[in-house]
Amino acid sequence: MSEVAHSTVAFGGHFARELPELAIPWRAEEAPDPQLLTLNQPLAVELGFDPDFLRSPEGVRLLVGNALPEEATPVAQGYSGHQFGWYSPRLGDGRALLLGEIAGADGKLRDVHLKGSGRTPFARNGDGLAAVGPMMREYIVSESMHALNIPTTRSLAVVATGRQVQRETLLPGAVLTRVAGSHLRVGSFQYARASNDMDLLRRLADHAIERHHPSSAGESNRYLALLKGVISVQAKLVAQWMLVGFVHGVMNTDNMTVSGETIDYGPCAFMEGFDPGAVYSSIDEMGRYAYRSQPVVAEWNLARFAESIAALIHEDEEQAVALAVEALNGFRQEYSAAWFSGMQAKLGLPEGIEDDVASPLVDDLLQLVQETRADYTSFFRSLGKAARGEVEPARSQILDLAAFDSWLERWQALNPDADAMDQVNPIYIPRNHLVEEALASATEGDIGPAERLLAAVSHPYSERPGLEKYAEPAPESFGPYRTFCGT
């Protein structure tokens, strides 16, 4: 039985109370020797936690779910999902627990969630555990995404459990404490719809509207408005991924949130040499979730969401389908508008520029960058210098110099805003070789490299002396990069 923790923050049980059909009450496995590896102090303060309490033995036990406030109602959440296109009717939190929700200063609820806390009834054949490396990966990358102003779940802490985890070798175990607007997924709706319980589906949709799309409540068709709201936030989210070269790696429907937050950083990576076909996940053998495919997959996932709530949109099936298809047809326009606006910002182009000027400028540049496999992040950052007249850092990354010089002339004639470019083109991202270096050290008990990498990527747009290694592409000796989900 869990100890009672005297937290400075009250835990609510809104999801568990309102949607008991999707929540199995459960407790985290006892961690033999929990030790705090890293704590996100700014986030802790933002949530109302006392960081000193979270660093105490009692606080650390709270972070692994072994000491909870009396009001906490931890549950494993149920959901379905299409994984690599194949439907799995019963997935759920196999190694995770929702401890409850806490109210932020803005009044919005935030989930506090554990990952790697032990087997649940949804575990299937898994051991329910997680290793230090994958949990530190999610901490580093999610906090980098937050610093890049991309909607994401957050990481509050990583705690080593003192338990060994069997993977290819024995690895030190860990629990990640994750914070999110919610953990409502497309797969949550697939699970509810498959139950044929329309009351449950309606309550789930109303819960999503209240938490993430409150403006939908005032619409004449609130569930159609919910669909449009989720389409909109996902179109903008995936556009932001594409603009920074982020490859999620496992865009299953259970990894698409209705809040529009990025979730699940298992086999993710940041693209270095620009390659639209980039795939990093070791399990994505067919390239389903390649960089260039992410918008297409997002649209496909949203169609599965529309199918799940179609019966709420209209009682007549034909009319429901027609309304849903019309809403889905808006995805490509919203995505394209968000991506193109972001690309114009990356090039420092003035507002109001005509599309027939900006569009070929963008297309021609990306063709040059692709032909050279130039480092995506470094190249766009170097364009800020080119806008100030220092063209060689960018020029040196392109093979077809005559074509690039011609492009430069067209671009510079538009007076690009170098300062604005530096606010959207990062210099520091979680480069894959540095992430692997940090994870290897953390696995061996040295958290220093991870902390230094976090310090760099937490301020991605501000160039600082002494951090040159964090701005450099991987050395050739690093070789082709492959990622693993860690389960």
UniProtKB/Swiss-Prot annotation:
Domain of life: Bacteria
EC number(s) per entry: 2.7.7.-, 2.7.7.108
InterPro entries: SelO (IPR003846)
Keywords: ATP-binding, Magnesium, Manganese, Metal-binding, Nucleotide-binding, Nucleotidyltransferase, Transferase
Cofactor dependence: Mg(2+); Mn(2+)
Pfam families: SelO
KW Transferase (keyword) present: yes
GO MF terms, alphabetically ordered: AMPylase activity; ATP binding; magnesium ion binding
Catalysis: reaction(s): L-seryl-[protein] + ATP = 3-O-(5'-adenylyl)-L-seryl-[protein] + diphosphate; L-threonyl-[protein] + ATP = 3-O-(5'-adenylyl)-L-threonyl-[protein] + diphosphate; L-tyrosyl-[protein] + ATP = O-(5'-adenylyl)-L-tyrosyl-[protein] + diphosphate; L-histidyl-[protein] + UTP = N(tele)-(5'-uridylyl)-L-histidyl-[protein] + diphosphate
Binding site for ATP: G92, G94, R95, K115, D127, G128, R178, R185, D264
Active site: D254
Transmembrane stretches, start-end: none
Residues binding Mg(2+): N255, D264
Family classification: Belongs to the SELO family.
PANTHER family: PROTEIN ADENYLYLTRANSFERASE SELO, MITOCHONDRIAL
NCBIfam families listed in its UniProt record: PRK00029.1
Function: Nucleotidyltransferase involved in the post-translational modification of proteins. It can catalyze the addition of adenosine monophosphate (AMP) or uridine monophosphate (UMP) to a protein, resulting in modifications known as AMPylation and UMPylation.
Protein name, entry field: Protein nucleotidyltransferase YdiU
The organism of origin for this protein: Paenarthrobacter aurescens (strain TC1)
